[in-house]
Amino acid sequence: MEPLELEGFLNLLKPPGMTSHDVVAKARRLLKEKRIGHLGTLDPDAAGVLPIAIGQATRLIELVAGVDKAYRTQLRLGAVTDSQDASGRIVKTGAVPALSRDDWEETLRPFRGQILQTPPMVSAVSVGGKRLYEYARQGIEVERSARPVSISRIEIVHYDPATPEEIVIDVECSAGTYIRTLCHDIGQRLGCGGHMGWLIRTRSGLFSLRDSLTLESLAEGPPKEQIVTPFEALAHLPALEIGENRLAALSRGLAQYLQGDGWSEGQWIRMHRRQKLLAVGQAIRKDEQWLCQPRKVFTRLETRSK
């Protein structure tokens, strides 16, 4: 494959058995582009949507990665593991209760909305300058603070009373939600313990499973028609169109006036010209006027892949 001039986002399908870093490394080789990063780690055993940023779009990862996610997962009841998933060692077992659909609705209700969740030991959260998974490898458990996360939807997809220990659920949640911890906490609520069996990420923001590309298809040829432009990838942000007479000022990093009062301090805004992203900025209040202060100004973005 010849070197490509691509900038934007690709929606890749991560297979189980590969790390997210492995997927990025392979994409770099296939696309012959060093500037590639992923938008949110998936565990090696997990599969599903793993969007990648290419070229200058890597500067936007933090703004695109912080969107809501959706997952399908298997909850296995009756066993607690030290990793909260099927790869861990079973540390406790319990009898699985027989539950009706109404019972399940009552069980899941407290997990909807904003909840507090304690990060698992096998996570990349830093405590005392070290990642939690580094402590876990040494057999050390450290105290962690609970964090607020939001779950907008949690529904049962499959439940068979003949095999009550295995339940498939769909979850839509905020970035930073640990599905393995959700499975563990549901098991704790039922009193029998539980852990995550398998996990598929079905959506990350506007990137969905049905539109994802396999690494095999990526190897077959240039995926230019599959590129999601930075302007499109930031669709969750308000847009400010820049007039022709303000382009020079924007290139020098000068603030642009905002219309109206429906802004909040620090709010991110995509700054564009005819839906070509020029910069991203933040709303600031100055002299009773709202302005958009550019934070990241781009050159050639969204033009090379055309």
Curated annotation (Swiss-Prot):
InterPro entries in the record: PsdUridine_synth_cat_dom_sf, PsdUridine_synth_N, tRNA_psdUridine_synth_TruB, TruB_C
Domain of life of the organism encoding this protein: Bacteria
Record-listed E.C. numbers: 5.4.99.25
Keywords: Isomerase, tRNA processing
Membrane spanning residue stretches: none
Catalytic residues identified in the record: D43 (nucleophile)
Catalytic activity as recorded in UniProt: uridine(55) in tRNA = pseudouridine(55) in tRNA
SUPFAM superfamilies membership: Pseudouridine synthase
Gene Ontology annotations of biological process type: mRNA pseudouridine synthesis; tRNA pseudouridine synthesis
A GO term, aspect molecular function: RNA binding
Matches recorded under CDD domains: PseudoU_synth_EcTruB
UniProt KW Isomerase keyword: yes
Keyword Oxidoreductase: no
Stated role: Responsible for synthesis of pseudouridine from uracil-55 in the psi GC loop of transfer RNAs.
Family per similarity comment: Belongs to the pseudouridine synthase TruB family. Type 1 subfamily.
NCBIfam families associated with the record: TruB
Protein name: tRNA pseudouridine synthase B
